[in-house]
Amino acid sequence: SGNLLCVKVVPRIPILHAVPNQGESFYMDANGNSMPTDQFLLDLSLVTGYVTTEFAKENLLELAQFMNTQAPWNREIQQIHVTSNQRIELVPMKGEHIIVLGSSADVEDKMKRLGAFYDATSENMAWQRYATLDLSYEGQIVCKKKKNK
């Protein structure tokens, strides 16, 4: 008698789902803690490619938090992809283009530029002419046209 057990439970809420080219897929919470994905499936920012837990923790947490909370990006971006040289690309729901972020630095500014570009080209859907929209250059968007088939 008199024995008391106190348990403090702190829920970890994942903010991104990583499916790397090599290794096990994982969820990561806002504190950079990874957790296994075999227990449940959540609708989160999907990260693919050359992503490790360390890279995700150092480079993708802020980006995933931004994408999950900022309209319209939380519904317009379906995938975050990490290339073999660790450049970050976004795959939008609409269109057949790739959005090149480069790094996750200045993500808010980069996405403002992208939003302004989409707004300016939405009437004639001119953004569909491009294979890539590169936001990695400060203050500009460099567009690469699609190759003719």
Region annotations inferred by a language model:
Residues 1-149:
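Charged, solvent-exposed interaction patches on well-folded alpha/beta domains
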